[in-house]
């Protein structure tokens, strides 16, 4: 297979906690130094690298004397706050040995959901890369709650790939890559060297406790690859303990599973809409409206809406679902939730008589709508 990493100019590398900590108890300085060495070698090949690294909570636990991971939200946030200092210090020291500057960037979903903050983060990252800096990104665990978390750094890595239009996403994990079934349980499981990002069969294999691949965190990686593919980024899932894995990938060696992006690249504006993990509201569409959106590329009219939930204002991003609850699209609404409830199931010609004004004949214009 063609190596997505060898030809990539801009790469996001996600390193999981198990690869930068001592069995979850504090940071592994030697391991981090090796990652820094490999990234420096990638930069020498002319590649721009952004690192998404876990490990802050594990380091904070050690510094604060926790024997096991706390269950309280505030204790976890305290561990993250303390541990992030150590994580930044070790990365800075490791890269400065090679005369490379690093930058710490902590993101939340709110940063990427707000259009202005999204563009600011994008501009900052581009500027850092132009200055030859290696940005090191993590979720800002000190301020987020479960309801607004990215959920995992696989997802964060994909969102950053989209944010700066990276060519490739490398997800380093404690497994070799993807198998057709859980190799720990099925001796006939075969290794998947290459597949298409967004392959529904692959998602089905990895989904849920009863799936053939088991849980094992692989579904989040498959979904991250699907998300990264929206901006044209290819994904490689590889074993992080593989010797010199990054430099060998950059040299064109086939390691791990490569999930290839084959979908049309979204515009930057539509990419921003697609990357909303949490939207302001949800509307349910009838079958006719679903077909108009998915098969004909039409705008969404009020007559095709059968239910409105949530509280949203004009200009908010909302999710469109079919009657089974499956997400079909996201888009920027022309009407508030209360207005949408009044005009749903009505023809656009009735909007003026119902509301006393007409913003637009469409609830969501097709230029402000992205299919999922």
Swiss-Prot record:
Q: What is its EC number?
A: 2.7.2.11
A single MF term (Gene Ontology): RNA binding
Ranges for domain PUA come to: 280-358
Q: What reaction gets catalysed by this protein?
A: L-glutamate + ATP = L-glutamyl 5-phosphate + ADP
Protein's pathway: Amino-acid biosynthesis; L-proline biosynthesis; L-glutamate 5-semialdehyde from L-glutamate: step 1/2
Source species of the chain: Herminiimonas arsenicoxydans
Report the domain of life of the source organism.
Answer: Bacteria
Where it sits in the cell: the answer is: Cytoplasm
Q: Which residues bind ATP?
A: 14, 173-174
For this chain, the family text in UniProt reads: Belongs to the glutamate 5-kinase family.
Task: Please name the Pfam families in this protein's record.
Answer: AA_kinase, PUA
Question: Which residues are substrate-binding?
Answer: 54, 141, 153
Name the record gives this protein: Glutamate 5-kinase
**Alphabetic keyword roster:** Amino-acid biosynthesis, ATP-binding, Cytoplasm, Kinase, Nucleotide-binding, Proline biosynthesis, Transferase
What GO biological process, any one, is recorded here? L-proline biosynthetic process
* One Gene Ontology cellular component: cytosol
Q: What class of enzyme is it?
A: transferase
The UniProt entry, under HAMAP family, shows: ProB
Query: Does Kinase appear among the keywords?
Result: yes
Please give the function described in this protein's UniProt entry: Catalyzes the transfer of a phosphate group to glutamate to form L-glutamate 5-phosphate.
CDD domains (alphabetical): AAK_G5K_ProB (cd04242), PUA_G5K (cd21157)
Q: Which SMART domains match?
A: PUA
- Is Mitochondrion tagged as a keyword? no
């Amino acid at each position: 297979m063609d190596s997505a990493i060898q030809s990539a100019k801009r790469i996001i590398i996600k390193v999981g906690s198990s690869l930068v900590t001592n069995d979850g108890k504090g940071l592994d300085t030697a391991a981090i130094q090796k990652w820094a060495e490999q990234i420096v070698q990638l930069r020498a090949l002319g590649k721009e690298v952004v690192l998404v690294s876990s490990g802050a909570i594990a380091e904070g636990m050690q510094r604060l004397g926790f024997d096991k991971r706390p269950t309280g939200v505030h204790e976890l946030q305290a561990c993250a706050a303390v541990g992030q200092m150590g994580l930044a210090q070790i990365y800075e020291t490791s890269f400065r040995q090679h005369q490379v500057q690093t930058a710490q960037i902590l993101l939340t979903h709110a940063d990427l959901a707000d259009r202005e903050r999204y563009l600011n983060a994008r501009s900052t990252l581009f500027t850092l890369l132009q200055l030859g800096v290696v940005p090191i990104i993590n979720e800002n665990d000190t301020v987020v709650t479960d309801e607004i978390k990215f959920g995992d750094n696989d997802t964060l890595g994909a969102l950053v790939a989209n944010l700066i239009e990276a060519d490739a996403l490398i997800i380093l994990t404690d497994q070799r890559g993807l198998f057709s079934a859980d190799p720990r349980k099925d001796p006939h499981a075969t290794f998947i060297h290459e597949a298409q990002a967004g392959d529904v069969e692959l998602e089905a294999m990895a989904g849920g406790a009863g799936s053939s691949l088991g849980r094992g965190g692989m579904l989040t990686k498959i979904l991250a690859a699907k998300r990264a593919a929206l901006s044209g980024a290819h994904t490689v899932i590889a074993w992080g303990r593989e010797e010199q894995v990054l430099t060998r990938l950059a040299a064109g060696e086939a390691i791990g599973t490569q999930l290839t992006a084959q979908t049309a690249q979204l515009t930057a504006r539509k990419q921003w809409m697609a990357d909303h993990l949490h939207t302001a509201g949800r509307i349910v569409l009838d079958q006719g409206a679903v077909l108009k959106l998915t098969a004909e590329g039409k705008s969404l009219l009020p007559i095709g809406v059968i239910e409105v939930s949530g509280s949203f204002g004009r200009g908010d991003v909302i999710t469109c679902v079919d009657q089974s609850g499956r997400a079909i699209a996201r888009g920027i609404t022309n009407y508030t939730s209360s207005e949408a409830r009044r005009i749903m199931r009505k023809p656009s010609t009735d909007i003026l008589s119902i509301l006393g004004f007409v913003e637009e004949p469409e609830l969501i214009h097709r230029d402000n709508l992205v299919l999922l």
